[in-house]
Amino acid sequence: MNNIITNKIINKEEKLKYLIAIPCVNRTERNALNIIDKTFEGFEKAGMFESEIDFDIILFESGSIDKSYLNFIEEYKTKYKKNIFIYESNKKENANTNTHRMFLYIRKVPKNYYDFIVWMDDDVFVCQKFMENADAWIKKYANFSFFSSLYVPYRTYFINGSLNVQHADMSNFYGTCCTIFKPEVVNLPIQNWFWQHFELFNFNPDARFRDCIRKKFTSLKKICVSYPSLVQHMNIGSSIYNNKNVNKGHKCNNFVGVDVDPKFYENIK
């Protein structure tokens, strides 16, 4: 655990490399609406593809029959020369098996290739200069928490003297719209992902991730989260619950906004 929670601030000048990992599926095959193209439009509007922050994007495709919903990705790869990859499955996955497959992939990546994983959903909004702001926050605070989140729909607590970070009870964590962790963290959920209790009560990926860590490290009570949130859940239907209903699901109430740059890269010292 000492390699994960180092309690050390990362120098602002140090160059980190991130993997943005996004599980996805052709939602029309799950009685929901495809929205990932709008997510990428938001990424573009936020300046992500022109950012100097070093990151790759991997889409973990859930074994959809029709994968043409991802054809638009080629436009971004051609226009911006960015590393955007699609990791396909040869069988139909659900949210839990696909996330487990994502963790297995991350575990096989050479050690120290990525500094942090940014686990996101395929239906999110992001703030302006998202990568610059995320990079600044991660360098200052991510080493003080087993995992962190830049999307915070649950209760948090102020930390004296800190403006852009708050504490949350780990037991309250849910929503993987923007979860931050070091690659070696995946070893824990991989070990217990299909625990009988999770299967019996049909836990979703966020709850399994959280409780795999809590099960191993019972002394861990808090996580560090951003304030305000840099990411918002679109909340436009669900491929997990097979519905097209708008505004049925979780959402945070402290999202900074798609047109706002919170300037963490200037304000976080």
Predicted regions and their residues:
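C-terminal catalytic/acceptor-binding lobe
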Residues: 2-3, 22-24, 30-39, 193-269
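Hydrophobic targeting segments
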Residues: 16-22, 43, 55-59
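Short beta-strand-to-loop acidic/aromatic patch adjacent to the donor-nucleotide binding site
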Residues: 114-125
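Active-site-proximal specificity loops/subdomain of glycosyltransferases
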Residues: 63-114
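Short, acidic, metal-binding catalytic loop of nucleotide-sugar glycosyltransferases
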Residues: 38-53
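Phosphate/oxyanion-binding active-site loops and adjacent basic polyanion-contact surfaces
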Residues: 28-36, 69, 91-99, 126, ...
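Short, solvent-exposed loop/turn segments at secondary-structure junctions
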Residues: 25-28, 64-65, 92-94, 123-125, ...
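Conserved catalytic core of nucleotide-sugar-dependent glycosyltransferases
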Residues: 125-202, 206, 211
